[in-house]
Amino acid sequence: MPTLVLLRHGQSQWNLENRFTGWVDVDLTAEGEAQARKGGELIAAAGIEIDRLFTSVQTRAIRTGNLALDAAKQSFVPVTKDWRLNERHYGGLTGLNKAETAEKHGVEQVTIWRRSYDIPPPELAPGGEYDFSKDRRYKGASLPSTESLATTLVRVLPYWESDIAPHLKAGETVLIAAHGNSLRAIVKHLFNVPDDQIVGVEIPTGNPLVIDLDAALKPTGARYLDDSRAEALPKVG
C-alpha cells in the first residue's frame, strides 16, 4: 500500500524574526538545518524507503528535503520541484513583523488574516520589493497577489491530483517537503477536515508525518515519527 510522508521545512531566518514569510525565499537557520537532518534520521530509523521527493521552489523546503534524504542515506531519490507547493502567499503582509502588524491593525484583524479559512490578507502591490512576477522560477505562471488557506488549497489540489497522486497509486512511498499551509491543504483534502477546523491543525517543523493510504488514497493510519513533538491529528476514517 502507498505511504505518504509530509515534512514541514525546518526553522527559517524569518521564522526566527517572527515575520510573515510567504513566498520570500528565506533560507534555513542552523537550527532549521538540524531539524531537517533529524527528520531524515527519523525516516531512516523507521525503515521508510522513499521513492520520490516533491517540494516547492523555495529554498527552505528544497534544502529541508535534500538534507532529510541525505541524513536518511537516500539522496539518490528523484526530486520534483513545483511552485504550486509553495507556502501560502501573504500578500501585503509579506515581510512584516507579526507582533508589529498586530499592534497596527489589531490582534483580531491579524488573527482573521492569518487563521480564517477563506479571508485573505490585503493584496501585494505590484512592482514592490516582494513582487515575484519577474522571478524566473515563476516564468509563465499566473501568480496570486494574496491567498487564504482556501485559495492555497485551490492551487495545491490540482497539482496533487495530476502529479503526486499517480505515484502513490502506483504503490510508491512519497515524501513531500513543503510548508505549513501547503501541507495543511493536503491534510484537509486527505482527511476531509471541515473548513472551520483545518485552521487549527498544526504541523510541526522537521517532524515527519507518515500517512498510510489504501489503494484509493484514503488514510488508514497516521503518525508523527517524533512523539515528543507531535501535534493532534485528524481522525482516520
From Swiss-Prot:
Annotated substrate binding sites: 8-15, 21-22, 60, 87-90, 98, 114-115, 180-181
Name of the protein in question: 2,3-bisphosphoglycerate-dependent phosphoglycerate mutase
Self-association and partners: Homodimer.
Active-site positions on this chain: 9 (tele-phosphohistidine intermediate), 87 (proton donor/acceptor)
PANTHER family: PHOSPHOGLYCERATE MUTASE (PTHR11931)
Pathway per the UniProt entry: Carbohydrate degradation; glycolysis; pyruvate from D-glyceraldehyde 3-phosphate: step 3/5
Reactions catalysed: (2R)-2-phosphoglycerate = (2R)-3-phosphoglycerate
SMART domains tied to this protein: PGAM
UniProt-annotated site: Transition state stabilizer, residues: 179
